[in-house]
Amino acid sequence: MHFVEAKGILSSNNGMNIYRGCTHGCIYCDSRSNCYGFTHEFEDIEVKANAPQLLEKALKSKRKKCMIGTGAMCDPYLQAEEKLKLTRRCLELIDKYEYGVAIQTKSTRILRDMDILKSINAKAKAVVQMTMTTYDETLCKILEPNVSTTHERFEALMQFKKAGIPTVVWLTPILPFINDTKENINGILDYCMEAGVKGIICISICIDVFFLKP
């Protein structure tokens, strides 16, 4: 883990990534791609130490309220967040200035910030997006070894349902011959129905092509 002083925090579509890199160890992760310009090892987390200060400046300068998104490129609830609490500090600012938030994660650590998310949802809108890849817990621990299991994520969704916070599930990636079975997909859909999610996102089937040198 290393710290940097970032120049900006919000993208043109109001997305932010407080961290760069990941320690979840998901074997299918495409964020490792060279197209994202990483200059450090993916597991060596880059921490934008001044993220809260940059976010506050950006929120103050906006003319219209909007939804702030986080989690598209890097999970905001990595293990490092337990100690650093940068995601929590940014949520506190979103709450303070009465913006909405859409936050994507695979970690039940998000439950720590239930109080702030409830406050944001009362003033604007808070949407929790949880990725679910496989209903099979054994397979989950192989595909995503260092993060909450699918059942633990389901239990978190149930807590957000009880709190009245809308949720969305990313059913992705679908990996041919690995998690593309009827039993797996139906199992996740059953979780989604029980948790009362407001939407299910399934982008595409994931097929990686490897070119071997002769």
Task: Provide a role label for each language-model segment.
Residues M1-Q129, D136-K141, T150, F154:
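Conserved Radical SAM active-site core
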Residues I120-A122, V147, N186-I188:
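Short, hinge-like loop/turn segments at secondary-structure boundaries
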Residues E137-N146, T172-F177:
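Surface-exposed cleft-lining segments at the edges of enzyme active sites
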Residues E82, C140-L143, D180-E183, G187:
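A short secondary-structure junction signal
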Residues E152-F211:
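Conserved C-terminal portion of the radical SAM core fold
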Residues R109, T134-D136, L175, D208:
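Surface-exposed, flexible loop/turn segments at secondary-structure boundaries
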